[in-house]
């Protein structure tokens, strides 16, 4: 009699769990459809940012490359100086007191599968002393197999490293911070973002490159202030959001360049430093655009972007290419990131 009761209870619980699972699956499916309707596709290409920066400085130019998706390209901003590539190039030039030649092969909508071609395009444009990659969001939103996505990233890093480039990868952002994505889908997307970032870090560092945990460092700030850090589409960052991303990546970029040049490095590990074993780190300068006011250390520690002044444009005398020979930093599809 008791066994029959247990069996009946188990059947009831199992049935309830199955029903609950079906309801949750249905809810998530509905939220996916809602998010897809709410988040618009890319409407226009971001400003082209490739070119020469820091012309006021003398010496051999530093070759910098930016690869990846819309975060790398700067989708949604209105001026070249607001793009991550321009901000990074200007900061590197100011810090090193040398000119910087920037090649941008990033493309809006890029998954990791496009990275090997982007890396080859960097080499075709003359190579890079340092390459910075922002990637992962489109792989998560498209449900790309994690191992497959990471394999493409590792291939691109390997190609760049074999050509003599140092590489810094900003790993997958926290997509759970995107306002149109609601719970419980938000919880799943956040988990998938973190899993992708962990896998990226492991693969990238195995290739001798450096990583910056973009989601870990910026997710809380975007959660706390979406109106400031997200653009009008509520999916891509605003100019302030891109500035915040540059602020957490910049210290690692500068530290890696210091290490490569044999310059002394500070022992501190500010937000945004990489994780490669034995890397020296130092505080970034905070200067991220020609004519822009530096961001003070308290703003950087809190993850809050500072306001930028009007900035100078760079001379576009270098152009990288995206897969298929397209213009750099332009939309390759109607994907969201």
Predicted regions: what they are:
Residues 238:
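Short, conserved phosphate/pyrophosphate- and ester-handling motifs at nucleotide-, phospho-/glycolipid
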Residues 35-65:
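N-terminal signal-anchor transmembrane helix
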Residues 163-165:
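A short helix->loop->beta-strand "cap" motif at the edges of active sites that frequently abuts
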Residues 15, 177-213:
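Substrate-gating cap/lid alpha-helix
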Residues 63-65, 71-151, 295, 299-303, ...:
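Conserved SGNH/GDSL esterase-like catalytic core that processes O-acyl groups on lipids
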Residues 134, 170-171:
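Alpha/beta-hydrolase-fold catalytic nucleophile elbow
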Residues 148-151, 155-159, 195-202:
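Alpha-helical scaffolding segments of alpha/beta enzyme cores, especially the outer helices
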Residues 2-34, 244-337:
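Conserved catalytic region of serine esterases and O-acyltransferases that act on ester linkages
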């Amino acid at each position: 009699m008791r066994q029959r009761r247990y069996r009946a209870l188990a059947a009831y619980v199992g049935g309830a769990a199955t029903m609950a699972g079906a309801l949750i699956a249905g809810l998530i499916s509905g939220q996916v459809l809602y998010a897809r309707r709410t988040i618009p596709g890319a409407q226009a290409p971001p400003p082209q940012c490739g070119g020469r920066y820091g012309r006021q400085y003398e010496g051999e130019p530093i070759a910098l490359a930016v690869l990846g998706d819309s975060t790398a390209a700067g989708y949604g901003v209105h001026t070249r100086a607001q793009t991550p590539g321009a901000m990074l190039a200007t900061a590197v030039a100011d810090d090193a007191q040398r000119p910087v030649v920037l090649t941008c092969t990033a493309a809006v909508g890029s998954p990791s599968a496009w990275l090997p071609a982007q890396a080859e395009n960097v080499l075709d444009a003359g190579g890079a002393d340092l390459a910075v990659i922002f990637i992962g969001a489109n792989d998560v939103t498209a449900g790309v197999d994690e191992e497959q996505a990471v394999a493409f990233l590792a291939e691109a890093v390997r190609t760049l490293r074999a050509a003599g480039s140092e590489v810094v990868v900003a790993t997958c952002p926290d997509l759970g911070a995107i306002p149109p994505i609601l719970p419980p889908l938000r919880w799943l997307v956040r988990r998938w973002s973190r899993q992708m970032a962990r896998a990226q870090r492991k693969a990238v560092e195995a290739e001798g490159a450096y990583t910056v945990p973009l989601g870990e460092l910026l997710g809380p700030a975007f959660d706390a202030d979406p109106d400031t850090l997200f653009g009008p589409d509520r999916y891509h960052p605003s100019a302030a959001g891109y500035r915040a991303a540059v602020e957490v990546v910049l210290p690692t970029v500068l530290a890696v360049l210091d290490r490569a040049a044999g310059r002394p490095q500070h022992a501190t590990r500010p937000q945004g430093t990489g994780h490669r074993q034995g890397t020296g780190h130092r505080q970034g300068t905070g200067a991220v655009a020609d004519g822009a006011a530096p961001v003070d250390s308290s703003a950087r520690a809190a993850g809050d972007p500072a306001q930028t002044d009007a900035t100078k444009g760079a001379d576009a005398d270098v152009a990288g290419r995206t897969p298929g020979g397209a213009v750099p930093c332009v939309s390759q599809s109607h994907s969201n990131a």
